[in-house]
């Protein structure tokens, strides 16, 4: 609820309406009482009879001034002149101030309820924000863990591929070196450039037959036994 110039205007309008309504009722009541009093006065004047045996009122009798007739006259005078308007307006003003204070108090209670509701909404939003931050941190942690696992898997795959390629190269090299008699497009291997004595006779190579007379050992005997040429020479 807005408390400001608009609320003040509304309060002033309500105050004026209340005062006018009460003043109107007061004037109507005053008019009715005046009519009744005037009628009563006229009736008393026509019906009043003198009392010849009545004693005159003494001047020192203080209670005589406060007789009911005098009090009624004072009341009639006050009603005729409106001497009590100030007191009535003060009473009305007091009632208006009380009603205005009550309205302000009600507005303050409404504003307090609104503020309490907004504070509760802020607390709910804060709790939701904290929960969202926790969920985001958990997702970030899981993402980092998954990224580390992918890195390890990629490293393992690359290492396995390199190891497999190395194994393939090694197997191919071993197969060519030890299984194939011909290497490098039909050319002889470097370590086969020179003829090596074998157990089979080689007719393509003319060798000088040498006799190791000084080393007549078992190896020479074995060579002589296995080689027919050495056997004929011996």
From Swiss-Prot:
Biological process according to GO: spindle pole body duplication
Chief location category: nucleus
Pfam families assigned: Spc29
Chain positions covered by the region annotation Disordered: 38-57
Keyword terms: Cytoplasm, Cytoskeleton, Nucleus
GO cellular component terms, semicolon-separated: central plaque of spindle pole body; cytoplasm; nucleus
Record family assignment: Belongs to the SPC29 family.
Function: Component of the spindle pole body (SPB) required for the proper execution of spindle pole body (SPB) duplication. Links the central plaque component SPC42 to the inner plaque component SPC110.
Protein name: Spindle pole component 29
Organism lineage: Eukaryota, Fungi, Dikarya, Ascomycota, Saccharomycotina
Gene: SPC29
């Amino acid at each position: 609820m807005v408390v400001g110039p608009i609320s003040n205007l509304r309060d002033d309008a309500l105050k004026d309406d209340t005062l006018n309504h009460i003043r109107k009722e007061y004037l109507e009541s005053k008019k009715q009482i005046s009519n009744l009093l005037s009628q009563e006065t006229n009736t008393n004047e026509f019906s009043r009879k003198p009392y010849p045996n009545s004693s005159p009122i003494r001047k020192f009798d203080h209670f005589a001034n406060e007789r009911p007739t005098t009090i009624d006259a004072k009341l009639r005078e006050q009603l005729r002149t409106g001497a009590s308007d100030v007191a009535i307006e003060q009473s009305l003003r007091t009632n208006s101030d009380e009603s205005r204070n009550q309205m302000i108090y009600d507005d303050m209670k409404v504003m307090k309820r609104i503020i309490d509701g907004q504070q509760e909404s802020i607390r709910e939003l804060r709790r939701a924000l904290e929960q969202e931050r926790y969920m985001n941190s958990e997702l970030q942690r899981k993402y980092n863990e998954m990224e580390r696992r992918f890195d390890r898997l990629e490293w393992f795959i690359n290492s396995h591929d390199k190891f497999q390629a190395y194994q393939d190269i090694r197997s191919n090299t071993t197969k060519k070196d030890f299984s194939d008699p011909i290497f490098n497009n039909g050319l002889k291997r470097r370590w086969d450039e020179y003829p090596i004595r074998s157990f089979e006779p080689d007719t393509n190579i003319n060798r000088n037959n040498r006799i190791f007379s000084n080393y007549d050992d078992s190896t020479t005997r074995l060579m002589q036994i296995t080689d027919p040429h050495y056997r004929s020479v011996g």
